[in-house]
Amino acid sequence: MSKVTKQSKSHKSSELVSLAEKIKQKALENRKQSREESQATEEANTASETEAAVIEETAEPEEGFSSFRELDLVPELIEACDNLNFTKPTPIQSKAIPPALQGKDIIGLAQTGSGKTAAFAIPILNRLWHDQQPYYACILAPTRELAQQIKETFDSLGSLMGVRTTCIVGGMNMMDQARDLMRKPHIIIATPGRLMDHLENTKGFALRKLQFLVMDEADRLLDMEFGPVLDRILKNIPTKGRTTYLFSATMTSKIDKLQRASLTNPVKCAVSNKYQTVDTLVQTLIVVPGGLKNTFLIYLLNEFIGKTTIVFTRTKANAERISGLCNLLEFSATALHGDLNQNQRTGALDLFKAGKKSILVATDVAARGLDIPSVDLVINYDIPVDSKSYIHRVGRTARAGRSGKSVSLVSQYDLELILRIEEVLGKKLPKENVDKSIVLSLRDSVDKANGEVIMELNRRNKEKQTRGKGRRSRTATRENMDKEEE
């Protein structure tokens, strides 16, 4: 809920107004103090083995190319790389691009943010220049947001080549997408369920002459149970003459089975993804007494006011509620979760990336595959049920050498989950310093605001049910498979 209604705002209690005023006053103090402390904090983090852990890619000594100009690329592609400031390749690019340019199938093992999209986009575009035909390449991605980002990369790299791309994902109008497909794009970026819908139902659309197939974030494609759909897609595209790239964060038995079914004599290009301690991400936790999680969250947002922050929740309902709570208390927040349509999700991300909203409240849909630059703080409102999700969440900050911080709100029911996470990280997470007197002073106001938000959400849900009453539900399609889990 991006905003509460005017009626709700007009009934703000004096306590809420008082809290908002305290927040503003604290913000001024924090901004002044942060200038004085930021340099000292950076030096302290660098000088010591701080409480930090994140997946870091440690590349082996590179034997590949050191500049994109060394490659046998068409001039238009080299110029596009220059325009995008692609100078020195990332480890996965250095390992994957040379064999890909030789026409090899590729298995790329690398994390999000490693530059892997360009690692498969550059070879595809280079060959497309010499053999332009419609439906030349298809890239499969697990989420709509990742698919859109891949499209943007292809558009940027192919900007001087006249490349036509389209993004085919759930949550968007099928007829509009069918019209886009009839314009014969060179590159199709899609989520599996929606692509299969079009292969079965869009007249005149087929991938019988497909030259490239890319499965990006393949481990997550399989985690989200796209396996049966992938099998059906593979049966609808040619095997002979097709080049296939498979990119994944990990090499599991499912990935191994998929690569044996879809790749031919692939070259494995792996970038180490061991859990390593780095000094750019400080991780802490707060043990939260019952009934105080909302209050501790507002306390943290107040302490770090002005910082770009992602708050992760386990459910879509919590994401919507917390976004509304933040906005009611005059924090600038927007929500991102699977119940939003594609335009709403794109709009939320754009607001956050542009700095118009400083807080993004999200389910794990945003934890992986999204390039969100310059995130200062990650707050785990709900602890994820698996350690891998935790690693991907905190990996949204402290990227590309920047400093960052994560704080996890731990209830008595989360202790076992935290122990598992600490075991994976190989260290204990220290406790965040908290002024409990300030936290307790905020409790009544935060609880009152939370009650108002819940009432407003309930009112909206009743309105939706009333509007939808009597309507016949339409048959669900595989579009639902493109929606992320809560």
Curated annotation (Swiss-Prot):
<feature type="short sequence motif" description="Q motif">
    <location>
        <begin position="66"/>
        <end position="94"/>
    </location>
</feature>
<keyword id="KW-0539">Nucleus</keyword>
<feature type="compositionally biased region" description="Low complexity">
    <location>
        <begin position="41"/>
        <end position="52"/>
    </location>
</feature>
<dbReference type="GO" id="GO:0003723">
    <property type="term" value="F:RNA binding"/>
</dbReference>
<keyword id="KW-0347">Helicase</keyword>
<dbReference type="InterPro" id="IPR014014">
    <property type="entry name" value="RNA_helicase_DEAD_Q_motif"/>
</dbReference>
<feature type="compositionally biased region" description="Basic and acidic residues">
    <location>
        <begin position="476"/>
        <end position="486"/>
    </location>
</feature>
<dbReference type="GO" id="GO:0000462">
    <property type="term" value="P:maturation of SSU-rRNA from tricistronic rRNA transcript (SSU-rRNA, 5.8S rRNA, LSU-rRNA)"/>
</dbReference>
<keyword id="KW-0067">ATP-binding</keyword>
<dbReference type="GO" id="GO:0005730">
    <property type="term" value="C:nucleolus"/>
</dbReference>
<feature type="domain" description="Helicase ATP-binding">
    <location>
        <begin position="97"/>
        <end position="269"/>
    </location>
</feature>
<feature type="domain" description="Helicase C-terminal">
    <location>
        <begin position="300"/>
        <end position="446"/>
    </location>
</feature>
<feature type="compositionally biased region" description="Basic and acidic residues">
    <location>
        <begin position="21"/>
        <end position="38"/>
    </location>
</feature>
<feature type="short sequence motif" description="DEAD box">
    <location>
        <begin position="216"/>
        <end position="219"/>
    </location>
</feature>
<feature type="binding site">
    <location>
        <begin position="110"/>
        <end position="117"/>
    </location>
    <ligand>
        <name>ATP</name>
    </ligand>
</feature>
<dbReference type="GO" id="GO:0006364">
    <property type="term" value="P:rRNA processing"/>
</dbReference>
<dbReference type="InterPro" id="IPR014001">
    <property type="entry name" value="Helicase_ATP-bd"/>
</dbReference>
<dbReference type="InterPro" id="IPR050079">
    <property type="entry name" value="DEAD_box_RNA_helicase"/>
</dbReference>
<dbReference type="GO" id="GO:0032040">
    <property type="term" value="C:small-subunit processome"/>
</dbReference>
<dbReference type="Pfam" id="PF00270">
    <property type="entry name" value="DEAD"/>
</dbReference>
<dbReference type="GO" id="GO:0003724">
    <property type="term" value="F:RNA helicase activity"/>
</dbReference>
<keyword id="KW-0698">rRNA processing</keyword>
<dbReference type="GO" id="GO:0005634">
    <property type="term" value="C:nucleus"/>
</dbReference>
<dbReference type="InterPro" id="IPR011545">
    <property type="entry name" value="DEAD/DEAH_box_helicase_dom"/>
</dbReference>
<keyword id="KW-0694">RNA-binding</keyword>
<comment type="function">
    <text>ATP-dependent rRNA helicase required for pre-ribosomal RNA processing. Involved in the maturation of the 35S-pre-rRNA and to its cleavage to mature 18S rRNA.</text>
</comment>
<dbReference type="Pfam" id="PF00271">
    <property type="entry name" value="Helicase_C"/>
</dbReference>
<dbReference type="GO" id="GO:0005524">
    <property type="term" value="F:ATP binding"/>
</dbReference>
<feature type="region of interest" description="Disordered">
    <location>
        <begin position="459"/>
        <end position="486"/>
    </location>
</feature>
<dbReference type="InterPro" id="IPR027417">
    <property type="entry name" value="P-loop_NTPase"/>
</dbReference>
<dbReference type="InterPro" id="IPR000629">
    <property type="entry name" value="RNA-helicase_DEAD-box_CS"/>
</dbReference>
<dbReference type="GO" id="GO:0016887">
    <property type="term" value="F:ATP hydrolysis activity"/>
</dbReference>
<keyword id="KW-0175">Coiled coil</keyword>
<feature type="region of interest" description="Disordered">
    <location>
        <begin position="1"/>
        <end position="52"/>
    </location>
</feature>
<feature type="coiled-coil region">
    <location>
        <begin position="17"/>
        <end position="49"/>
    </location>
</feature>
<keyword id="KW-0547">Nucleotide-binding</keyword>
<comment type="similarity">
    <text>Belongs to the DEAD box helicase family. DDX47/RRP3 subfamily.</text>
</comment>
<keyword id="KW-0378">Hydrolase</keyword>
<protein>
    <recommendedName>
        <fullName>ATP-dependent rRNA helicase RRP3</fullName>
        <ecNumber>3.6.4.13</ecNumber>
    </recommendedName>
</protein>
<dbReference type="InterPro" id="IPR001650">
    <property type="entry name" value="Helicase_C-like"/>
</dbReference>
<dbReference type="InterPro" id="IPR044765">
    <property type="entry name" value="DDX47/Rrp3_DEADc"/>
</dbReference>
<feature type="compositionally biased region" description="Basic residues">
    <location>
        <begin position="1"/>
        <end position="11"/>
    </location>
</feature>
